[in-house]
Amino acid sequence: PDKYRVVYTDYQRLELEKEFHYSRYITMNRKAELAKSLDLTERQIKIWFQNRRAKERKINKKKDVMVKEP
């Protein structure tokens, strides 16, 4: 398989999480800046944000279920 999984460093994850906390959607300019400073490609950052939003939806769904259950 030519597809490999990117393993982010703790620092990269922390910076991406901080950015996500600030805004769930990243601008093109900010994506370019982050890519440079974190030594990642813009594509990797785009995909990290997509995955992180999906994770948040999943977490929120679980919360909904917990609230609805008696």
From Swiss-Prot:
BP term (GO), one: anterior/posterior axis specification
Domain of life the protein comes from: Eukaryota
Pfam families xrefs: Homeodomain
GO molecular function ontology, one term from the record: DNA-binding transcription factor activity, RNA polymerase II-specific
Location(s), subcellular: Nucleus
Any one GO cellular component localisation term in the record: nucleus
Keywords for the protein's UniProt record, in alphabetical order: Developmental protein, DNA-binding, Homeobox, Nucleus
PROSITE patterns referenced in this protein's UniProt entry, alphabetically: HOMEOBOX_1 (PS00027), HOMEOBOX_2 (PS50071)
Feature: DNA-binding region: 1-60
Keyword Transferase in record: no
Entry similarity comment: Belongs to the Caudal homeobox family.
Protein name (Swiss-Prot/TrEMBL): Homeobox protein CDX
